[in-house]
Amino acid sequence: MKSDTLVTGLKKDKEIELTVTGRKSGKPLPRPVWFVLRETELLLLPVTGTNSQWYKNVLRNPHVKIRSSQQSFKGKLRAITERKQVDEVIELFKVKYGPSDIKKYYPNPNVAGSLQLN
């Protein structure tokens, strides 16, 4: 199953490429992002929260593409805005990347994103 292979590959990666569609240009905009996995759910944390350009683009068009070192996947990214759920994502990021890096690189983690991989 493709999602099993994707999840297995993602477990080895620290960074993926996220491609969103520009809300003004309509062009694909790839960028490297950190992520965490929760079973078959890929979770993202915009570096500057609601001010992140990729997050603003996703609000306009939630269809995204991710590319790992193993393969790529297209899906629909769901915005997570409820504080408790965002805090859960932040905690998962702290486990994977370390609390000091999350504090350093994520000054305003007030939203997150979820992409189902199955």
Predicted regions and their residues:
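Short, structured beta-strand-loop surface elements
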Residues: 49-118
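Short helix-to-loop capping/linker segments positioned immediately adjacent to catalytic or ligand/cofactor-binding
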Residues: 5, 20-25, 100-105
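A broad, low-specificity signal for short, low-complexity segments enriched in glycine/proline
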Residues: 3-7, 26-28, 35-40, 73-80
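A generic structural micro-feature
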Residues: 10, 25-27, 58, 107
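Covalent nucleotidyltransferase core used to form phosphodiester bonds in nucleic acids
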Residues: 6-8, 43-56
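Short beta-strand segments
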Residues: 13-47, 64
